[in-house]
Amino acid sequence: MKLSSACAIALLAAQAAGASIKHRINGFTLTEHSDPAKRELLQKYVTWDDKSLFINGERIMIFSGEFHPFRLPVKELQLDIFQKVKALGFNCVSFYVDWALVEGKPGEYRADGIFDLEPFFDAASEAGIYLLARPGPYINAESSGGGFPGWLQRVNGTLRSSDKAYLDATDNYVSHVAATIAKYQITNGGPIILYQPENEYTSGCCGVEFPDPVYMQYVEDQARNAGVVIPLINNDASASGNNAPGTGKGAVDIYGHDSYPLGFDCANPTVWPSGDLPTNFRTLHLEQSPTTPYAIVEFQGGSYDPWGGPGFAACSELLNNEFERVFYKNDFSFQIAIMNLYMIFGGTNWGNLGYPNGYTSYDYGSAVTESRNITREKYSELKLLGNFAKVSPGYLTASPGNLTTSGYADTTDLTVTPLLGNSTGSFFVVRHSDYSSEESTSYKLRLPTSAGSVTIPQLGGTLTLNGRDSKIHVTDYNVSGTNIIYSTAEVFTWKKFADGKVLVLYGGAGEHHELAISTKSNVTVIEGSESGISSKQTSSSVVVGWDVSTTRRIIQVGDLKILLLDRNSAYNYWVPQLATDGTSPGFSTPEKVASSIIVKAGYLVRTAYLKGSGLYLTADFNATTSVEVIGVPSTAKNLFINGDKTSHTVDKNGIWSATVDYNAPDISLPSLKDLDWKYVDTLPEIQSSYDDSLWPAADLKQTKNTLRSLTTPTSLYSSDYGFHTGYLLYRGHFTATGNESTFAIDTQGGSAFGSSVWLNGTYLGSWTGLYANSDYNATYNLPQLQAGKTYVITVVIDNMGLEENWTVGEDLMKTPRGILNFLLAGRPSSAISWKLTGNLGGEDYEDKVRGPLNEGGLYAERQGFHQPEPPSQNWKSSSPLEGLSEAGIGFYSASFDLDLPKGWDVPLFLNIGNSTTPSPYRVQVYVNGYQYAKYISNIGPQTSFPVPEGILNYRGTNWLAVTLWALDSAGGKLESLELSYTTPVLTALGEVESVDQPKYKKRKGAY
């Protein structure tokens, strides 16, 4: 907001005195801070009181969804997600930055190409989405190491603490990433409005000071020193009050916390356990941070799923549209003002970036699927709530009351929480007292209104709350000067147009609803049947009752048109902001929100703008669709949909109507089994002629890992030697005495890892993996060895990613990968000298384009054969569907062409066949050099792997590379490998440019 000069002088005086002050403007209390940079920012751009944020002086609710750019590395598709978030009625996206991807080598920060954040920020601005930046340095995020690069395993200090070694290690990363964020702050015309230092800094143990104000202040100062001046917000993992304003050093500007109340039991998606619905968040907020707006920086939008889990379809069922209605509206009962859903779009754990407990997909059961589809009902349900919040500013200034089972509803089976407004309307959140109830409950309400206390319905009948449902009833709700005394039907949106006002209400199937309006005007049904609609005129109001119908009815009361919809019909409505200068909708300011039009258009409406006499809509279609536009400006004469002039009609109510035909294109995909597959053995290490002289020697007599002491003569921890990702290989040399009978080995790779062991060329056995096992002790019988002869033990270990570091003091991120211990029977451990390798170069990784985690330590990966156009001319012809006849690891490469039609968004999937009794094998699939599938046949669950356009060349040549690791003496093979697609979407997204896909080039020093 703009301050008067007198107010500004007072603030400057307070600044000079080094004091923070409070001032009141338009009835709201704002806090100004003594820090000059912060104070200057807050008085102009982002301020707050105890109710909400203000952006440029305008009160706003932040409704946000989490989206990680590193999990969708195609820039044009990032814009797609932003536009789908904007279409929900949301105004913000929260994002993490994964440190491990941009500083793979200490001191070398690389944020270019697919890791460049600036196109992500530009796309947010184009879509009109604010950003909450969360760069860590620790992020958790179900990412390898919680976002920590593997080399932190060597830091001589406690991670996430004020130990100097750790703080020094973070400086390079934070100084760079925070400077980039600072460049794109709202103060510089960018979209970033909030900055979160650290992440879920909530739990400590093991004698470490916690919470450590010195540490938290250091992280905050890192951001400030890099130029970050926007407010700092935190996300306590629970509502514990850590680092809340007023707690001293390390306090943030705005306190926030996380909540995942329904948990992560996707195996039982219909079970809502007793007591899981939060009821005390408002009370805790008033105790912990009463001067800041109530913020939940991560509220449950889905669930993770582990190796061997039920799959994300089950997670989306657990956290479905019913969950949203009950839990999100419950959050509204606490007057939440900053609400971020984790996740809104999950994406993909491509290239080994995930943590060990999760698989390639990070779909998360979120509203937008991993393949960017929005057909989950939870997306549409979320759109109803997002648009309601967008047009209900009175919600932010109402006063929340206590939940009650008496006083409002006539049954104790229902609980009502009031948010009472003075002149800005009141809101009543109604739910079942047993929140998990699947019963339908009939009820009447008695609500305080400007017309007195009213028992509703007045015209007879009862209201109904169906099972696992919740409603927000409004009273004295302002529709641009028209007072809605009450409405039991829920508000989707309302708008004031040049020729009148429009209010859109909806209800569930079979429900009866009623509203009352302060007016002396009569009720006229101007569209649809009058059947089921009743009304009554009083001296100062009109009351309307109706039964919800699947057929739209429109009633007119004075200059107000009211659309009466059922919920499923409301799902098809969109409220795009109407741009009049350019094509971008802009950010969600009150002026921009007021400019919106209402469009019924099915699958997706991205944008709307005026150009000359044309109204332009950009929209996506997955079926032939009738398009209707409500509130068309009088200057518009022609309709353009996706750039094409489209004939339209105008009905008596001024609604424009048109039809978009959907004619699905012919999609021709290659048969992957019939490609010209070439094969090379990618475990030459078990051949007698193999030379490992170029391998790093595992000869460190001490580890730099402070978590676990060595139990071997030299360190066999991979991160001691710079190997942090993908498959690890070890070769142990010894000279036999002839008395060795067994070899025991303890390997560690994280949940669901596997390992295999050979003696020279003889297969000894494998650990095929279980989700519950992060390490495994195995003992293998040896054949009779010849005294004096040299033998080599070859060990392959699947590094599933590094552990997260959630609890400060445990330092679990330092949990080593590799060999923990071994025993050659009858021999001292020193009898074996070891070498090891992972990805070629380790921290001096070869592929700077695809990043430090994408490739592992297999021979073919070290050579770069997984990249396009490997030197396969003289390789053997063989397919992964033929596979291997014995234990080992094969590498397969083939190319194919795609020629998919432009203007269509066609989700493509790699599908790996799986039987009920598969042989144990592990597969990696590289697409144009990017690892986009990691499959474990005996664990699962994922068999279908989305691969986005831009990674796949939709109109060009593509290269597939498959590594097949058979962990059984009988070998293994893929039962099938197919490319498939789901419903093509006629899209307005535009051209998608392929990411950089460097081809194979002989690597210097590759072994």
Swiss-Prot record:
Changing residue 304 to F: Over 33% increase of hydrolytic activity against lactose compared to wild-type. No effect on hydrolytic activity compared to wild-type. 58% reduction in hydrolytic activity compared to wild-type. It comes from Aspergillus niger (strain ATCC MYA-4892 / CBS 513.88 / FGSC A1513). Glycans are attached at residues 156, 402, 422, 478, 522, 622, 739, 760, 777, 805, 914. It catalyses: Hydrolysis of terminal non-reducing beta-D-galactose residues in beta-D-galactosides. Disulfide bonds join 205-206, 266-315. The lineage of its organism: Eukaryota, Fungi, Dikarya, Ascomycota, Pezizomycotina. InterPro entries: Betagal_dom2, Betagal_dom2_sf, BetaGal_dom3, BetaGal_dom3_sf, BetaGal_jelly_roll_dom, Galactose-bd-like_sf, Gly_Hdrlase_35_cat, Glyco_hydro_35_CS. GO terms for molecular function: beta-galactosidase activity; oligosaccharide binding. The keyword Cytoplasm does not apply. It is an enzyme of class 3 (hydrolase). PROSITE patterns: GLYCOSYL_HYDROL_F35. Cleaves beta-linked terminal galactosyl residues from gangliosides, glycoproteins, and glycosaminoglycans. Coiled coil: none annotated. GO terms for cellular component: extracellular region. Keywords: Carbohydrate metabolism, Disulfide bond, Glycoprotein, Glycosidase, Hydrolase, Polysaccharide degradation, Secreted, Signal. Its EC number is 3.2.1.23. Belongs to the glycosyl hydrolase 35 family. GO terms for biological process: carbohydrate metabolic process; lactose catabolic process; polysaccharide catabolic process. Residues 1-18 form the signal peptide. PANTHER family: BETA-GALACTOSIDASE RELATED (PTHR23421). This is Beta-galactosidase A. SUPFAM superfamilies: (Trans)glycosidases (SSF51445), Beta-galactosidase LacA, domain 3 (SSF117100), Galactose-binding domain-like (SSF49785), Glycosyl hydrolase domain (SSF51011).
